[in-house]
Regions:
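A short, N-terminal "cap"/entry segment at the start of jelly-roll beta-barrel domains
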Residues: 1-54, 135-192
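A sequence-level detector of short linear motifs
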Residues: 15-16, 95, 165-166, 229, ...
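Beta-strand-enriched cores of mature, soluble protein domains
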Residues: 31-32, 73, 92-94, 100, ...
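Conserved short histidine dyad/triad with adjacent acidic residue
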Residues: 35-44, 51-71, 94-96, 103-109, ...
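A short beta-strand-loop-beta hairpin characteristic of the jelly-roll/cupin
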Residues: 70, 76-97, 203, 209-232
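Short hydrophobic/aromatic-rich beta-strand segments that constitute the beta-sheet cores
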Residues: 86, 124, 166, 219, ...
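A short hydrophobic beta-strand segment most commonly corresponding to one strand
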Residues: 103-104, 117-134, 237-238, 251-267
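Short, Lys/Arg- and Gly-enriched loop/turn segments at beta-strand edges
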Residues: 109-116, 228, 244-250
Length: 267
């Protein structure tokens, strides 16, 4: 994971490392922590979510693109697939790849030349003007986990038997190429880094959209015991809020961007 701040200068763009707030966890986590919240035996945990105005996605045709902003305010853009190159005037170009994120002001993106390569897919969050805030720190890049081939994009849901199952998640990119999806409301978002850990069978408790930015996560479903492996640029929407749930196995320092949605606003 690499996080940057992009600012426009007269004939160039300035690219600087950006500190972000993130929860760090290492080792195993008791499954009862989640089971008790899902059953109501203990109160829901405070997720310390950061507010977001919206989230949206886009797939880009290879070549130039002029609608990277399409709004106002502070925007956090995440590269899911392919590559995205930014250039201002005669200044040097900067290319972002899966696992890269950049914060920018929408008003500064209009004159920047944007070029997409290799079936580029993006997710963009409208963040608060004061994000990332005083608690932000520079993050380590995490354990490299380059993906080969298409991204693994799944959702895990609870079946009628109270067991969890995977299915494909095409709703992430619902629109034609070069067209942003409709802005979607979310409760908020946060970053987490989990290093080398395990959680036994547990429900997710919340609707949690996870974008993996480093490391490797194995998630095993309780319904058919299928194991899906998520690496940099992969996505899993966990919506098995109750029931038996799933197992998590984390390998390496795994950075994840987590988006939390209400039931009525889920994909």
């Amino acid at each position: 994971m690499q996080v940057f701040q992009i600012t426009k200068q007269q004939d160039a763009i300035s690219v600087s490392p950006l500190p972000v707030p993130s929860l760090y966890r290492k080792g195993d986590v008791p499954a009862e922590y989640y089971r008790d919240q899902a059953s109501g035996a203990s109160p829901r945990a405070d997720l310390n979510l950061k507010p977001a105005r919206f989230v949206r996605t886009i797939r880009l045709k290879d070549g130039g693109f002029t609608g990277l902003a399409g709004g106002t305010g502070a925007l956090l853009t995440v590269v899911i697939t392919g590559a995205l190159t930014l250039r201002n005037g005669a200044g040097p170009a900067t290319t972002f790849v899966p696992g890269d994120l950049f914060l920018s002001q929408a008003e500064e993106l209009g004159d920047i030349t944007v070029t997409a390569q290799e079936d580029c897919g993006l997710l963009q969050i409208g963040v608060a003007a004061d994000w990332p805030g005083a608690e932000a720190t520079l993050q380590s890049p995490g354990t490299p986990s380059p993906r080969t081939g298409a991204p693994n994009i799944k959702r895990v849901y609870k079946g009628d038997d109270d067991l969890a199952y995977f299915r494909e998640f095409p709703e992430v990119f619902p629109t034609p190429e070069n067209s942003w999806s409709e802005p979607r409301s979310i409760r908020g978002f946060r970053f987490m880094c989990w290093e080398d850990g395990f959680i036994d069978w547990h429900p997710e408790v919340i609707n949690c959209f996870g974008m993996f930015l480093s490391g490797q996560m194995e998630i095993e479903s309780s319904g058919d015991h299928k194991v899906e492996i998520f690496r940099t640029g992969d996505i899993c929407l966990a919506e098995d809020r109750t029931g038996v749930g799933h197992i998590d196995r984390c390998h390496g320092a795994t950075h994840v961007l987590l988006l939390v949605s209400e039931d009525e606003a889920i994909w």
